[in-house]
Amino acid sequence: LSKKYDSLGDRMKGYENIARNYLTRRIPTIIRVDGKAFHTFTRGMEKPFDRILMTTMQNTMKYLCENIQGCVFGYTQSDEITLVLTDYATITTDAWFGYNIQKMCSVSASMATLAFSNAYAAELWKNFPEAMCSSDNGTNKYIETLVAKMGTAMFDARVFSIPKDEVCNCLIWRQQDATRNSIESVGHANFSQKELHGKSCNSIQDMLWKEHGINWNDFPVDCKRGSACYKTKVKETAPLLNDKGDTEMVEVVRNRWVIDREPPIFSQERGYVEKWI
């Protein structure tokens, strides 16, 4: 029975292994996590930019950076997060799940969904504590809409290897997409689809200024070109036992992941990205 059982198990694992694919080791890897049907999820949120959603995405990015092995840089814009992973810091550095594509995609998407749900709930509690404690949100349709969306967001993920020289270019591509999305979002918040049809981003900016007095350049940086996340040294206070056995607070320096809500334009400052890879 034991041999038959082992034979059956080996046969089943053989079917699994046929579809098991791996990325190339020792070159940078990109994970891109995308919100599933976020055009529906974001319905009823503030336009053109919802700060609750943006902060939630930023905190989700930070969680992924902190918890995915080998991650060295994160970037988020709109409903997507791009992560840069390396496995060559030392001669013995290992890769996340051995760069098993199925594992990386499924786990990163699951992690993003979990982290987003937790971060989203935390933002609602922080900004609308009374509404979170009551089933009656009164006449505030916005808060009611946000609360109703709790636990409904989902993400998918894709992973791929990329030459080291192309990592910054990949992020430039995503940041340029962020800028285009940003301008179009402000446009859609102020003009009809018919009025915007066939208009370039420069034309939309001109329309916003001439007809509504809105200067797109005045929006916060993270609204215009996304946010980044990287690890850096930060000063913190921590408890320490002194010679007398008493606890005192001392200043320490530790490596922490931080969110940069004012990243530069990557095409103009490539070193901002390239120093991490």
Identify the function of each model-found stretch:
Residues L1-I277:
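Regulatory and interdomain segments flanking nucleotide-handling catalytic cores
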